[in-house]
Amino acid sequence: MILDIHTHRPAPGAIVNVDPVDPVTLDRQYLYSVGLHPWNSDRVTPEALARLDTFAADPAVVAIGETGLDALRGAAIDFQQHLFDHHVELSESLRKPLIIHAVKTFPLVIAARRRHNPAMPWIIHGFRGK
């Protein structure tokens, strides 16, 4: 069995990634991960944070993320860390795994892991290619 746990294209049996920076709705025929991607961190609004919290608690959402830290794109790293910590807290309180994007920030991700000491799994999303 092959399971796609992270896709941006809805497909049967896949877990679809949703970023609540943009207004979206959850279609009940899919499972989801929901998170504020670091590339969009400079566009985060209070409404996007509220959507994140609401969506994260939905039973169709089975993972938190893609979230994380990116030294090359997005808002200042301090703000990204604030958002990342919020995602970690959601992951732990809702008992859902965390999907992480990390670019040139692995020491910060490791420090966050030590600081939070999470019980839920952390999944590093890796992508190489064009």
Predicted regions and their residues:
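Mid-domain alpha/beta scaffold segments of enzyme catalytic cores
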Residues: M1-K130
